[in-house]
């Protein structure tokens, strides 16, 4: 509870409540995330990919695996908390209040005894909040006081390397490519029952195949 709930979302709790679609495919990337998180050092995965490649779905899948106990023992009681830069900055135009919020968040993570892993869906935005909050986050990560999962695009990764090389060394990049046509079809098949139930419709296999084909062509 407390400050982490105020500025973040507990993905592990949401997963336990069945908030996320079933996860299909991407086993190699998920395994790689688990391997990185299980390390003693260099244990902060950075999911690098363009928007829409499924990076957030991977983090939700990880939260689901933690919630259902399908992870190595050292990750069994972890909580993944999404920390959004926009939520943190909202209403804190002055530098002082923003720094206080970041300090409170980082203190709460430290006080969790390693149980909380922050998910930073917009890492580059955090690092752009210079002069305090961004630097505090960078320092906490650089000293290994806080664990994090993060997400960025290839362009943002280059920016992070240029502007914060010490911080970028704390992250292990995992490339997330768009799903293949076969993977995309499997993903749609996985979420089809939920859509059918929610909208009271029946979705045929040819409709799914057409959706994949047209997405490849136009999206």
Annotate each language-model stretch with its function:
Residues 2-6, 21-33:
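N-terminal pre-P-loop "Q-motif" helix
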Residues 19-20, 30-33, 39-45, 114:
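Pre-Walker A (Motif I) flank of P-loop NTPase domains
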Residues 28, 39-61:
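Walker A/P-loop nucleotide-binding motif
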Residues 43, 78-80, 111-118, 142-150, ...:
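Loop/turn-to-beta-strand initiation segments
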Residues 63-76, 88-89:
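Post-Walker A helix-loop "phosphate-sensing" segment adjacent to the P-loop in P-loop NTPases
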Residues 72-73, 159-162, 166, 173-219:
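Conserved C-terminal "switch" segment of AAA+ ATPases
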Residues 81-110:
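Short glycine-rich substrate-engagement loop in P-loop NTPases that contacts/grips substrate
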Residues 130-131, 140, 154-170:
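Short regulatory helix/loop adjacent to the ATP-binding pocket of P-loop NTPases
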